[in-house]
Amino acid sequence: MKKKELSIFDKDILKEASINSIKKLNPVELLRNPVMLSVEIGSTITTFDFFYDLATNNNHAWFSANVSLWLWLTVLFSNFAESIAESRGKARAKSLREAKSNLFAKKLKNKNDKTYEKIPASSLQKGDLFLLEKDDIIPIDGELIEGVLLVNESAVTGESAPVIRESGTDKSSVTAGTKVVSGSAVAVASVNPGETFIDKMISLVEGAKRRKTPNEIALEILIISLTIVFLVVVINFRALSYYSVYSTNKGSVVSLVVLVALFVCLAPTTIAALLPAIGIAGMDRLFKKNIIALSGRAIEAAGDANVLFLDKTGTITYGDRQAYKLIPVEGVSEEELAMVAHMASIGDTTAEGKSIYAFTKAKYNLSIDLKDYKVIEFDASTRISGVDTKNEHYRKGSSDAIEKYVSSFGGSIPKNLDKIVEEVAKEGGTPLVVAKDNRIYGVVYLKDIIKPGIKKKFRELRRAGIKTVMITGDNPLTAATIAAEAGVDDFLAQAKPEDKLRHIKKYQEEGYMVAMTGDGTNDAPALAQADVAVAMNSGTQAAKDAANIIDLDNDPSKLIEVVGIGKEILITRGAITTFSIANDISKYFVIVPAAVSKSYPELNILNILHLANPYIAILSAVIFNAIVIPMLIPLALKGVKYRPMDAQTLLVRNLSIYGIGGILFPFFGIWIVYWICEIFWRVL
């Protein structure tokens, strides 16, 4: 179960965004967006010009009125784009607030005395102890120091299946607003009121603490610089117009309204209008995937990451060893081994035991109905499990444990057993030896199954220039086998925390951007060093503090998804910027010939659309410049889909679509608007 999708066309969101877009007309609000502030100033100038034309009975008052209207709409559409992104965030924040409202805590004086004082959750401070029991709503983020809980985290993650939280493990962290399904535990508050994970999520999705990323700042500097350049051009254009008219005694001075229209159409208003929405929508897109980015820098770094450190278990493999093959010893048939392995796994509740039972039943058509038997559960000291019937003893376990067991009954060890065990281990499997009474029958090859499609995914990442490194505690032989089968570029075997840290530093020194996942306290140093650090929400507080991205689903494979979303955000920003700047070329060929047609009729050669009425031509460009903003809002919010490919191919593809398309589309759009306006004016 995932979070409820919020439609772009949700009635409540559209209503709130419309109201906020009007409120944002306040010049103080627009100081954050200098380009749109300059458009608002231009709108004010043309509005005053309209009233002046009315007062002086100027025949072109209709032109001033329409240009003013569409310039104001340009600012409103820009505000609407940002407001709709913010409103989606506020809607999500509202549901999060409901998860933490009216919470109480059972405060303890010490963990040995379970007598508690019931206080408001807001009174708990970092370091305070509190009791958690069945049906309690967890009042504050904390770490279990005693006990085990089954917790429903759907209020935060959207996942209805409860999860286990246990003290002394890497899954000891509990989150405010989640509910205890069963169990009892003592926890220590790991944060102060207002600093909980839900509080951070609320701030982030509302955009209250969203800082501009380095790429956003660089892009803002670019579009502000372009705006200043075009402003200087327009001012000089006015001076040139004066000089031309008075020196040649022909034509007329370009009006203030035309100059403002020229400035607004040439300035990069499209990207300036949509840039805030792209940033906010990026956070929202991650949130829909149950991923919380604690900073905008983390998202950008994810988009630039070119080395992924991936945990083998959970990311590349399922983590549950499953029966893959039966290998009998000399003198034993495969069917005989299957029968003994099947019997030894009856009643076994472990994942491996269930796998062997299902495998032998399906492949060898075994179905045995035992009534009088005793299950011998796995014991860490003996490393053996099995079944005892009235007359027979079936066992399975590690090779040395089974050899010892068989020898105790006076049995012998098959000559080729060691070779079979060694070959299975070399291939990355786990050899489980099977015996009946004093005889060894063979080996069950247990394999940590590689997730389907993972090799294709790694191949796509490689094509996009991203290197994958598998992290595992397995021995080098096993690690090499799994790495080859999965298709990763490199692996780190028998990895200790200090090994991870050393390898991350090594790649960073070579100029790579490194991304990794982790959930334990021992992962914290490496997470802190990585450029993109994804911590599991179930992990320890130390791991979450060191990370800059939190995965609420506790799925290590999400790292690949995080990188993909990061690239989508960067590509979206680049695509709309390219489209916006390319638009200026088309609008130049419409407005400039129209503006100087009387003074310089020779420049009509630039009027490639052959628009006869210069006033309607300029108005058409202004209208198109305004309506393209709401047309691109869905793209800004949903993003340009990322397809794994090398940087050169991606650049050529996006330049073709958004560069060439950005030049051609306005010609077509302005031409359509022109003829609609022409027909409308003829009817009037």
From Swiss-Prot:
Molecular function per GO: ATP binding; ATP hydrolysis activity; magnesium ion binding; P-type potassium transmembrane transporter activity
Residues engaged in binding Mg(2+): 519, 523
Compartment(s) of residence: Cell inner membrane
Membrane spanning residue stretches: 61-81, 217-237, 256-276, 616-636, 657-677
EC assignment: 7.2.2.6
InterPro entries (alphabetical): ATPase_P-typ_cyto_dom_N, ATPase_P-typ_P_site, ATPase_P-typ_TM_dom_sf, ATPase_P-typ_transduc_dom_A_sf, HAD-like_sf, HAD_sf, P-type_ATPase_bsu_IA, P_typ_ATPase
Gene3D superfamilies: Calcium-transporting ATPase, cytoplasmic domain N (3.40.1110.10), Calcium-transporting ATPase, cytoplasmic transduction domain A (2.70.150.10), HAD superfamily/HAD-like (3.40.50.1000)
Keywords: ATP-binding, Cell inner membrane, Cell membrane, Ion transport, Magnesium, Membrane, Metal-binding, Nucleotide-binding, Phosphoprotein, Potassium, Potassium transport, Translocase, Transmembrane, Transmembrane helix, Transport
Chain sites annotated for binding ATP: 348, 352, 378-385, 396
Record bears the keyword Ubl conjugation: no
Main location: membrane
One GO cellular component term: plasma membrane
Family in the record: Belongs to the cation transport ATPase (P-type) (TC 3.A.3) family. Type IA subfamily.
Function: Part of the high-affinity ATP-driven potassium transport (or Kdp) system, which catalyzes the hydrolysis of ATP coupled with the electrogenic transport of potassium into the cytoplasm. This subunit is responsible for energy coupling to the transport system and for the release of the potassium ions to the cytoplasm.
UniProt subunit comment: The system is composed of three essential subunits: KdpA, KdpB and KdpC.
Name by which UniProt lists this protein: Potassium-transporting ATPase ATP-binding subunit
Gene from which the chain derives: kdpB
